[in-house]
Amino acid sequence: MKNYLLQIEYFGKNYCGWQRQSHSPSVQESLEKALSKIANQNIEVTCAGRTDTGVHATSQIVNFYSNADRPLSAWQRGVNALLPQDIKILAVQQVDNNFNSRFTAINRTYNYIIYNSATSSPIFAEHCLWENRELDIDKMNQACEYLLGEQDFSSFRSSQCQSNTPFRNIQKAEFIKQGSFIVFEVVGNAFLHHMIRNLVGSLLKVGLGFESPEWIKVVLEAKDRTQAAETAKAHGLYFVGVEYPEFSFKRQIIKLFC
């Protein structure tokens, strides 16, 4: 039995998220069906980060086991031929049998993309959040300082979150402006359900001047979801990277745009 790693890109608009669901199409279901056909056996995959409905990925990492004798090209080109246009395998490699894309991961990186312009863009409308009011990046980055380190993020988890603990360790949280785009890059060991989108919703209030940077600290310490702002929309969020002890994968979405 061999263990294979796949680097996946997908556009999440047409899916209920990564995880297989009985009532709606999922990225996992589409991938497993295509892999199973190439392998001529049932294939189940594990992913580094389960994205929600409408969320995208430029570098999702999955692994699966198979005893099917197939060249690496079959796992990429063959499977890609069976996948829909909004899901594609970028790379494939054989890895140690102990490798697990979820549990071996050290940290994960997400980008949230904001199109900050007076006029909306027909081209980017489905790829990023449009905000027509000017955002104060400096204040947003001041607020981000309060998010670093291992903390209780109860104020930024959804009511449906099933995690056993609200504690997460954030190593990086930063807004970067590139032209009309503003990119929120966040790196952490793991994230709670809707955590990043809830953070973005609150940080936008700071950027628009409705709250001070220190307000984020107050919300964090409250450990109460009702004290934070509304959840930012899903279509601006991208899973862009994973770091493992021996290698890492990262494809920042803004570098694909610009």
From Swiss-Prot:
Keywords: Isomerase, tRNA processing. One of its GO terms (biological process) is tRNA pseudouridine synthesis. It comes from the Bacteria. Gene3D superfamilies: Pseudouridine synthase I, catalytic domain, C-terminal subdomain, Pseudouridine synthase I, catalytic domain, N-terminal subdomain. It catalyses: uridine(38/39/40) in tRNA = pseudouridine(38/39/40) in tRNA. The keyword tRNA processing applies. GO terms for molecular function: RNA binding; tRNA pseudouridine(38-40) synthase activity. InterPro entries: PsdUridine_synth_cat_dom_sf (IPR020103), PsdUridine_synth_TruA (IPR001406), PsdUridine_synth_TruA_a/b_dom (IPR020097), PsdUridine_synth_TruA_C (IPR020095), TruA/RsuA/RluB/E/F_N (IPR020094). The active site is at D52. Belongs to the tRNA pseudouridine synthase TruA family. Homodimer. NCBIfam families: hisT_truA. This is tRNA pseudouridine synthase A. The gene is truA.
